[in-house]
């Protein structure tokens, strides 16, 4: 059994060493129909931009791979199965995994799933209205009703792609794009 908490314990310092915040770590089998391979998915971001560029992803991937190799050589095998390592930026319709994610995206639409029933339901979809840091509760308006959702009940949440979200998001880093266009024109 793969211990995600242990993997996070190893990955987070590697991300921090590069100046990144860890957004999410997931370990899953498949992803596409017929795909039996396991994937270790690591999402991270630069605190100032909320994204990573490809070079950042490559740097974190190398650090994590090297650290996992060191631990394995010392007899500490974190993942028994063969797996694919996937390092990425959270993207525009990002997952909301930390309290600060909910606070940062107030006013935007989100889909929130809970680990147990709240008002006879586990799924909410609507505008994030607030986050109470003291009670650790998320306010989300769904069909005109505002629900107070305890953060510790959230099992999965992500932003919903809307025009408002696109307008509010920082553009991706386009450095190097001119060189690519010039090469294609020649």
Swiss-Prot record:
Q: Does the keyword Transport apply?
A: no
Q: Mind telling me which GO cellular component terms the entry cites?
A: cytosol
Looking up InterPro entries in the UniProt record yields:
Ribosome_maturation_RimP, RimP_C, RimP_C_sf, RimP_N, RimP_N_sf
What are the alphabetically sorted keywords of the record?
A: Cytoplasm, Ribosome biogenesis
Biological process GO terms, please?
ribosomal small subunit assembly; translation
* Entry keyword 4Fe-4S: no
Mind telling me which Pfam families this protein's record contains?
DUF150_C, RimP_N
Subcellular localization? Cytoplasm
Primary place of residence?
Answer: cytoplasm
Instruction: Cite the NCBIfam families for this sequence.
Output: PRK14636.1 (NF011229)
Please describe what this protein does. Answer: Required for maturation of 30S ribosomal subunits.
* Family, per entry: Belongs to the RimP family.
Specify the protein name: Ribosome maturation factor RimP
Protein's organism = Novosphingobium aromaticivorans (strain ATCC 700278 / DSM 12444 / CCUG 56034 / CIP 105152 / NBRC 16084 / F199)
């Amino acid at each position: 059994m793969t211990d995600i908490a242990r993997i996070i314990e190893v990955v987070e310092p590697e991300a921090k060493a590069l100046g990144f915040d860890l957004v999410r770590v997931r370990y899953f089998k498949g992803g596409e129909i017929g795909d039996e391979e396991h994937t270790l998915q690591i999402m991270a971001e630069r605190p100032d931009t909320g994204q990573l560029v490809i070079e950042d992803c490559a740097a974190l991937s190398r650090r994590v791979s090297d650290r996992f190799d060191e631990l394995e050589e010392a007899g500490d095998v974190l993942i028994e199965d063969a797996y694919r390592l996937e390092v990425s930026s959270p993207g525009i319709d990002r997952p909301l995994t930390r309290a600060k994610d909910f606070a940062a995206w107030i006013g935007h639409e989100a889909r929130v799933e809970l680990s147990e029933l709240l008002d006879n339901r586990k799924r909410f979809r609507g505008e994030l209205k607030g986050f109470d840091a003291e009670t650790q509760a998320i306010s989300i308006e769904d069909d005109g009703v505002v629900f107070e959702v305890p953060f510790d009940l959230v099992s999965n949440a992500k932003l919903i792609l809307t025009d408002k979200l696109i307008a509010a998001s920082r553009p991706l880093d386009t450095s190097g794009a001119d060189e690519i266009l010039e090469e294609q024109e020649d």
